[in-house]
Amino acid sequence: MRQVKFREMLESLRQDLSGVPEHRTGRNTQYTIVEAGLAAFSVFYMQSPSFLAHQRDMERKKGRNNARSLFGVERIPSDGQIRNLLDPVEPGQLGGSFWEVYRYLDEGGHLEQYRGVGGTRLVSLDGSQYFS
């Protein structure tokens, strides 16, 4: 069983984000697409109502924050800025990272507990794309 390495998965995501074309016009480019993407990814690890407030609070109390320490995000965009930067990005542009992370998890045996009837994978959907 192959051990999943966080840094490998993060580097794959960083490479995909680096290839996303800049969609903004003008000079309003305080945060890069890479910073916004890594910050968005880090939100999955840090459950907090306000990602930015939590990171700033951690920085104030401990002198560092998880976004920088774990994900290499030096300048932390707000939740709204992350959405504004990433909403225009086509999901297919990050497909390589998704499948690479999937492969790491699958090879490491971490997905076995998510098998359903007939050996199929169980997938959680939030329902935002489905209507009755």
What is each stretch, according to the model?
Residues 1-132:
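Dynamic "connector" segments at or just before major functional cores
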